[in-house]
Regions:
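Zinc-dependent deaminase catalytic domain
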Residues: 1-150
Length: 150
């Protein structure tokens, strides 16, 4: 592992603490980097102007008994990877050739956004039970590295 991967993953874990997700263990962070410079950050949380689950004091998914990794549409939060990509779009920043550092392996919805954004490498810390996302990323030529294997 090189010093930059270590530094950016440490920062990604710090960004995850900004999450407004109420669900235990679901604080996710993401940083998009190019040429060893941070372009954007993202964490999972409610869209701008929408009350977060943390502020409400409950998780809609827990209340409805929805297991992690399913029915993503039934959640107030925007995923960390999505927020980082959306910030780049909002600011007019190209992500072509960038690296995404994230605390968790991206889901299939995020994988599709990552592919189309031009990100060419992902470094993730925690695995996620979504083989389809990995298939898509591999097929699209996105390099995916588990942090512990670097």
């Amino acid at each position: 592992m090189n010093k930059w991967d270590k530094r950016f993953m440490e920062l990604t874990c710090q960004v995850a603490t900004w999450s407004s997700c109420f669900r235990a263990g679901r604080q996710i962070g993401a940083i998009i980097v190019k040429d060893n410079r941070i372009l954007t950050t993202g964490y999972n949380g409610a869209p701008q102007g929408v009350e977060s689950c943390r502020d409400k004091g409950e998780c809609m998914r827990d209340k409805l008994g929805i297991p992690s990794g399913t029915r993503h549409e039934l959640c107030y939060a925007v995923h960390a990877e999505q927020n980082a990509i959306l910030q780049a779009a909002r600011l007019g920043i190209s992500l072509k050739g960038a690296t995404l550092y994230c605390t968790h392996q991206p889901c299939v919805i995020c994988a599709k956004m990552i592919i189309n954004s031009g990100i060419t490498r992902i470094v993730y810390k925690e695995g996620y039970p979504d083989e389809f996302s990995m298939q898509l990323l591999n097929q699209a030529g996105v390099q995916v590295d588990a942090y512990d294997n670097l």
